[in-house]
């Protein structure tokens, strides 16, 4: 069953109107807001289908324009939210969902938005479930002053943006598929990221709940929502209000391509390797026994297997990733992350890193200290203990006519940490692509499909809960 509609965008009427008005007003360019306004007008007057699609696009464009970049430096110090802009966005989001009709809406002191969509009449005793997405964007690529560009009825032509950024179907298989369907896609102007990670997820959750509020015929149980800060820093679940959450299972909406259903992820550790050397006057270095910590650190970096880096691995392969290095002759510090899908593989990776560090230090007569910090665990084991959580989701994909792609998450989500805390939480696709980059784009039809899945999921869980109640 399809609750939303993703037509072959756009209608001939839209294209005609768009071309006529752009000719009449040459100052209006594709980078500005005109295409979006024209899109809304045409969908209102030329389409007989439900306009959740328009509402969804509207909301997404609004959200990505808000700067919500998080700060790893602050988050690592325990500051949450790590930036005030996230808290400001959270407060606005809370007001929006309150107006839609959600109840118990609140923003915690740490910037989490919590709310509940009350159950349909007669479904109050259906077990609740929780939907989650995160409000922040990464700091590696700026998310300030995002200027989204809407490309209606994308035909596969190369898209040239600013700063030398271009999108080409020859280099992007998912983009090629979008072109085959004449999909509407949303990109940046090339100067920033887009923020589909995870404002696509935010938009889809809010739009789906709004749809349920206005369509009383679709029955559902109570649905909780959590919108979290600082997911991109790895601290998204540090202060999640578990005392408020009544759900025994949940779903993050933070994936990528349509159909992706993610129920396993990396085991993740951070590592800090500190080499201690000895400084002397360089003119007396041999006599005084200089020990250069930078040289030991350099040898350590060369010891890491080239075939086990992020850029040389995919699928179920783990890796070592160097994130930063700073140092002097006396002290050099290397910060890394380790990723592996199995516990055995992670344990072996930890031992391997220790060996590389110790042997590199010994080669230069330096001392070394290696510290590891667990970040999150693979959620596969816990989800296998609760198979109905994924089964409900698979049924929702089928009900929404979405093919299922079981893919491992080469990273983590708030759901992986929440699963570790006792609430099994698989991940749902959003229709966003090329995250954390100026090449990021989103597919409107795939975003609509995510809404279909969420609405179907609510129906399925309600039906199962209602059936069990009658027994």
Feature map (PLM): residue ranges:
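An extended, acidic, His-containing surface patch that forms the Zn2+-binding/catalytic region
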Residues: 371-471
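His/Asp/Glu-rich mid-to-C-terminal helical/loop segments that flank catalytic regions of hydrolases
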Residues: 45-46, 52, 291-310, 344-356, ...
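Short terminal hydrophobic/aromatic SLiMs and anchors at protein ends
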Residues: 5-14, 40-41
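Glycine/charged-rich beta-loop-alpha catalytic/anionic-binding loops adjacent to active sites
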Residues: 179-192, 276-280, 400, 432-436
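A short beta-alpha structural unit
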Residues: 77-81, 318-326, 337-342, 367-387, ...
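Metal-dependent peptidase/peptidase-like ectodomains
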Residues: 238, 242-295, 343-398
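Acidic/histidine-rich catalytic neighborhood of metal-dependent amide-processing enzymes
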Residues: 177-264, 309-323, 327, 334-341, ...
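Acidic/His- and Gly-rich active-site-bordering loop/insert found
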Residues: 46-185
């Amino acid at each position: 069953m399809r609750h939303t509609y993703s037509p072959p965008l756009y209608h001939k009427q839209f294209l005609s109107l768009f071309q006529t008005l752009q000719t009449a007003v040459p100052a209006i360019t594709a980078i500005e807001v005109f295409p979006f306004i024209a899109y809304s007008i045409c969908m209102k007057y030329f389409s007989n289908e439900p306009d959740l699609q328009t509402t969804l696009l509207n909301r997404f464009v609004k959200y990505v324009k808000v700067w919500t970049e998080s700060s790893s430096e602050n988050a690592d110090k325990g500051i949450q939210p790590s930036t005030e802009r996230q808290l400001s966005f959270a407060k606005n989001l809370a007001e929006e969902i309150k107006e839609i009709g959600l109840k118990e809406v609140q923003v915690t002191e740490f910037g989490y938005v919590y709310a509940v969509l009350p159950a349909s009449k007669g479904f109050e005793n259906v077990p609740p479930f929780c939907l989650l997405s995160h409000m922040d964007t990464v700091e590696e690529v700026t998310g300030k002053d995002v200027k989204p560009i809407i490309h209606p009825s994308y035909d596969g032509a190369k898209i040239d943006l600013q700063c030398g950024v271009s999108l080409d179907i020859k280099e992007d298989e998912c983009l090629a598929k979008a072109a085959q369907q004449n999909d509407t896609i949303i990109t940046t102007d090339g100067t920033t990221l887009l923020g589909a990670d995870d404002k696509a997820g935010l938009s889809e959750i809010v739009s789906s709940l709004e749809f349920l509020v206005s369509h009383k015929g679709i029955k559902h149980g109570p649905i909780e929502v959590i919108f979290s800060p600082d997911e991109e820093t790895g601290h998204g679940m540090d202060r999640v209000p578990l005392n408020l959450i009544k759900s025994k299972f949940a779903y993050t909406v933070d994936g990528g391509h349509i159909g992706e259903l993610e129920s396993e992820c990396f085991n993740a550790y951070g590592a800090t390797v500190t080499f201690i050397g000895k400084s002397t006057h360089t003119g007396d270095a041999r006599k005084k026994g200089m020990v250069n910590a930078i040289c030991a650190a350099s040898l350590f970096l060369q010891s890491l297997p080239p075939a086990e880096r992020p850029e040389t691995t995919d699928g179920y392969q783990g890796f070592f990733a160097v994130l930063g290095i700073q140092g002097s002759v006396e002290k050099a510090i290397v910060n890394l992350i380790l990723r592996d899908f199995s516990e055995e593989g992670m344990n072996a990776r930890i031992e391997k890193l220790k060996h590389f560090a110790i042997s590199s230090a010994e080669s230069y007569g330096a001392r070394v200290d290696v510290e590891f910090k667990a970040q999150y665990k693979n959620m596969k084991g816990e989800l296998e203990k609760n198979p109905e959580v994924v089964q409900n989701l698979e049924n929702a994909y089928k009900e929404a006519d979405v093919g299922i792609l079981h893919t491992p998450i080469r990273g983590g989500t708030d759901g992986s940490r929440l699963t570790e805390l006792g609430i099994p939480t698989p991940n749902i696709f959003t229709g966003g692509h090329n995250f954390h980059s100026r090449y990021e784009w989103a597919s409107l039809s795939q975003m609509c499909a995510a809404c279909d899945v969420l609405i179907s999921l609510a129906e399925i869980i309600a039906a199962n809960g209602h059936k069990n109640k009658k027994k």
